[in-house]
């Protein structure tokens, strides 16, 4: 599902690039306005403002979703009567529930596992639908914001450079921290 969302974000961002470029060209021609940057920078500005917030949200969601679902399902199984002596037994029951949901479980099913597998399917569905709605909400909100900035004939080149410098800084920081983690 995440690949589909990334693909949709890329397609929407690409279409915004062409829209932003053509919109600024038409504004410059029809209104005799001198643009503060080349039209392509307005397209880049739209792409960055559309894709970066959505991709960051998707990354954060993807990191925390499995942990949250696991804790909810383990709590659900415990409320239904499952007894865990330690963390390993809880993890084993959770993996059984996931296997039942995927249809790969070959062991004996009891009512606790069945109910927990149904709850797992329900929560997966809720989390997936929530993720899609929130990502498209972020895309729409960031697109509206960036389109308002374009209408004001902002200095898109400077803004794009600031965003790219920030991305390069974050990438360098990740590389340094990864190197320190290896050593």
Where are these regions (language model features)?
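Intracellular loop-helix junctions on the cytosolic face of multi-pass helical membrane proteins
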Residues: 151-163
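N-terminal prosegments of processed precursors
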Residues: 2-26
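Membrane-interface helix-loop junction between the first two transmembrane segments
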Residues: 18-37, 155
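Transmembrane alpha-helical segments in integral membrane proteins
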Residues: 14-21, 62-65, 129-152
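Membrane-interfacial segments
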Residues: 23, 27-28, 64, 68, ...
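Alpha-helical transmembrane segments and their helix-start/interface "positive-inside/aromatic belt" motifs
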Residues: 1-8, 35-59, 160-179, 183
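Alpha-helical transmembrane helix bundles of large polytopic membrane transport and channel proteins
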Residues: 57-137
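Extended, highly charged clamp/arch subdomains and adjacent linkers
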Residues: 34, 38, 72, 138-143
């Amino acid at each position: 599902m995440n690949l589909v969302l990334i693909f949709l974000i890329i397609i929407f961002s690409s279409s915004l690039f062409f829209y932003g470029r053509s919109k600024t060209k038409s504004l410059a021609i029809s209104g005799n306005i001198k643009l503060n940057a080349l039209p392509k920078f307005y397209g880049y500005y739209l792409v960055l403002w559309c894709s970066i917030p959505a991709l960051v949200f998707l990354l954060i969601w993807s990191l925390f979703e499995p942990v949250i679902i696991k804790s909810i399902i383990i709590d659900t199984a415990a409320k239904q009567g499952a007894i865990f002596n330690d963390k390993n037994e809880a993890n084993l029951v959770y993996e059984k529930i996931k296997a039942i949901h995927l249809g790969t479980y070959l062991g004996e099913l009891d009512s606790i596992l069945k109910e927990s597998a149904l709850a797992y399917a329900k929560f997966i569905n809720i989390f997936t639908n929530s993720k899609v709605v929130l990502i498209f909400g972020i895309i729409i909100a960031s697109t509206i914001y960036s389109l308002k900035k374009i209408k004001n004939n902002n200095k898109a080149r400077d803004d794009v450079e600031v965003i790219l410098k920030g991305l390069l800084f974050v990438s360098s920081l990740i590389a340094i921290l990864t190197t320190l983690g290896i050593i």
